[in-house]
């Protein structure tokens, strides 16, 4: 999240402009700050612009952001997502939640299935632990498939995109229906 010397002025300015930025790694801290800003802006009905630029991050925190955006939409606040630079991994799924979705000409999205990163401490995992992780990843992948289906992708395309890291440039994002338009103005 962007910070200024006077965080209160920034929050007031963001609320007035109805713009929220999601930048950097998606973490507990990032999602808390994003949801706090979203709640401030969503107090008054109207379109909310969400500018994203991130390598992704924590799946659960990203899903919290998606849930919060969906709740804002349900309260009468259409969401307009703008990809600026990159929306990789979890951030790509967040970018796809918008009612209107745009991307700058040289920006990219990257999709993949959920991954487990851990157990670097040298310990051996039991079959039960591995099964639990597998089950959790399957749930996340189901959510990712649902999010991609909601923008109109067919099953075969979704499976191809989740099979490995799939990078999509602005033109491809439009042709796939992931984004509605290429942004031509500075927001």
Q: What is the predicted function of each stretch?
A:
Residues 1-187:
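Terminal-region recognition feature
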């Amino acid at each position: 999240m962007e910070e200024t010397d006077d965080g209160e002025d920034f929050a007031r300015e963001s609320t007035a402009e109805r713009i929220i930025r999601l930048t950097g790694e998606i973490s507990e801290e990032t999602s808390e700050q994003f949801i706090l800003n979203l709640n401030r802006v969503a107090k008054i009905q109207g379109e909310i612009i969400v500018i994203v630029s991130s390598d992704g991050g924590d799946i659960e925190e990203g899903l919290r952001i998606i849930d919060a955006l969906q709740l804002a939409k349900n309260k009468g606040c259409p969401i307009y997502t703008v990809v600026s630079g990159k929306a990789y991994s979890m951030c790509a799924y967040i970018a796809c939640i918008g009612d209107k979705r745009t991307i700058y000409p040289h920006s990219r999205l990257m999709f993949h299935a959920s991954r487990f990163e851990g157990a670097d401490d040298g310990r051996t995992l039991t079959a039960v632990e591995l099964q639990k992780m597998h089950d959790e990843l399957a749930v996340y992948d189901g959510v990712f498939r649902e999010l991609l289906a909601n923008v109109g992708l067919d099953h075969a395309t979704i499976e191809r995109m989740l099979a490995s890291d799939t990078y999509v440039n602005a033109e491809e994002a439009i042709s796939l229906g992931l984004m509605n338009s290429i942004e031509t103005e500075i927001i």
